[in-house]
Amino acid sequence: MASMNDFIGRWKLVQTENFDEYMKEIGVGLITRKAAAHLKPILEIRLDGETWNFDQFSTFKNTKLSFKLGEEFVENSPDDRTYNSLFTFENGKLTHRQNKIKENHKSSVLTTWLENGKLIQTYQSGDVICRREWERE
């Protein structure tokens, strides 16, 4: 079973399913959705002491997310939504819970794990599930 340390490295996005549907479900606008649909970002995962860093790089927008496992924090999404977020790691899977703060926003659960040498992520909000696959760069 994988440990969080196995996630460390640079990953390139190679496959996406239902990403536009997921973005629509959480309220991302049409122009941003269309731009994001064609991106092939790089995800860099690092550990600095007890702080995990997930940095995503693309031609459209770069994002940085830092967290400590088991500690709730306020997260600002790339399109300016705000969440109370919590990361946990159990049975080889990293779970990222984004709990809405504003009534008109939607909560999500993002799950990350390793499978056959790939980094797999699912994003779920309501009944919509997106799957993304990343390969080591």
UniProtKB/Swiss-Prot annotation:
GO terms for biological process: fatty acid transport. GO terms for cellular component: cytosol; nucleus. The keyword Aminoacyl-tRNA synthetase does not apply. One of its GO terms (molecular function) is fatty acid binding. The lineage of its organism: Eukaryota, Metazoa, Ecdysozoa, Nematoda, Chromadorea. This is Fatty acid-binding protein homolog 7. It holds the Pfam family Lipocalin. PANTHER family: FATTY ACID BINDING PROTEIN. It comes from the Eukaryota. Belongs to the calycin superfamily. Fatty-acid binding protein (FABP) family. Keywords: Lipid-binding, Transport. InterPro entries: Calycin, Fatty_acid-bd, ILBP, Lipocln_cytosolic_FA-bd_dom. The gene is lbp-7.
